[in-house]
Amino acid sequence: MFSKNQSGSSLNRQLFETYMALDNWHQFRLRLFIEGIFVGIAGGLSISLFRFLLNESEDLRIYLYYACLIPALRRDDLLPLLSYALLLIAIGGALCAMCRYAPMAGGSGIPQVKGVILGLMKMKWLRILWVKILAGAIGIGAGLSLGREGPSIQIGAVAGQGLSRTLGRTRMEERYLITSGASAGLAAAFNAPLAGMMFALEELHRNFSGAVLLPTMTSAITATIVTRCFFGNGTSFHFVDLVPLPAQYLWYVALIALICGLAGIIFNYGLLHIGAFYHPKVFRTQASKIIFALLCAGVLGFLLPQVLGGGNHLVDQLAVTNYPLVFLLLLLAAKYIFTLISYGCGAPGGFFLPLLVIGALTGAVLAHLLVNAGLLSAVYTPNVIIIGMVSLFAASVRSPITGTLLILEMTGDFDHLMVLAFASAIAYITAEILRGRPIYDALLQRSLAASPDTACEEEKNMIEVPIASGSLLENRPISELPPMKQTVIVEIKRSGKSLIPDPDTRLRAGDFLYILSESRNAETLKRMGEESNVK
């Protein structure tokens, strides 16, 4: 039985406003639709500023190397080299100070957003907004192997949170607006509105509720329109004249996806255990970690500049350049290791784009082997590179639909939908069989354990719990739900109709259960609504 002992003005206000929203469900969804447009505008403008600063900082880094540092190295002039090293140290100190000022702005930002949506973490939206834009552009621009997608998703999310706080919305509505902001963030980062919308549904909320779909769809489309006004309609990757892969090569696709599924497990393992490298006896402060990573970037700028930054230009080069196998393996190893070093230092930036680049390099290595063995024509090398990207993403993130749509939109070629979906499925199944954890779930749990100060205080929030077919909650009466204190079932939505909760009411697949509870209790019910009853 659920406790009916509820008191307090905060709880009463949540109940009243939520009842109002649920009783006027169609008006509530229309309001979310309109608010999604404003979230998309705010997120699109913020991310456009972030992308502009990032592009300028990367151009400045390239200019410094080719105009100053490389010529100085050739003439044995140490002054410019020492000056650049001091600049990197100063940048490291500044990034550390900003991360100390806004701890939730460090790292990718996606686990943090997910934690806030689940009601497990809290964000100070205005502080994170400017720190993420500035620190992300500086760190990635200085050469760290980090991506713009994580910061963009968090920037969009805090834009949605800011709108919610400005308008005084309930926590339930705020979660929808944060989700729509995250959707806008991914869409604006890569000109990929479909992937942005699907990421919010598949990864963040893990259900296809209409209340989630409407604001995420409008915000993703609006944010994409805004960013295209500044950066044009071009795709992130530029593959020219892709030839569709014949059906007889599908077993190659399965083999490549299987290998990339294994690579995804290895990538996740490295990302979760890079902390052992940054041992506290050697790296006593976060500043020392960031400075070390930046100095590594400074050295790699002379040796392997291809692995610096996100790496989308490297993917374009792989499609048109026949690199030797040894050099491809060197690039793969260097990109993987430097991505771990960059992410592990805690500087603001994601691993989404570096993950795709590592997948592209893995695909390039496999394509080289297949072509040299006479098993595949060289004309299909770009196809294998794309398959490597989508497979590694599906294995690591465990969001195969998002990965498929993202690569399709980033390449601008939808003729490969079937092949990419097939590869995503194989890689996903491989990772599931090997019992690898989805990377963002693992990072969220680690963040909650390592930084309890960022966790939410136990407050009552309205949570939407979808009931999946075959789940632990399907066909259960309300009276048989697990006992939880301070929890109230407010309403059940079934086929668009509202049902008043009754102890004898049985839950059906497709129902949406609206409960007012502490976040951790609600998360337990959400897992039961998703997990299969088959053991």
Description of each model-found segment:
Residues 459-467:
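Short glycine-/aliphatic-rich beta-strand segments at the starts of folded cytosolic domains
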Residues 468-525, 529:
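Cytosolic Rossmann-like ligand/nucleotide-binding regulatory domains
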Residues 530-535:
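A common structural junction motif
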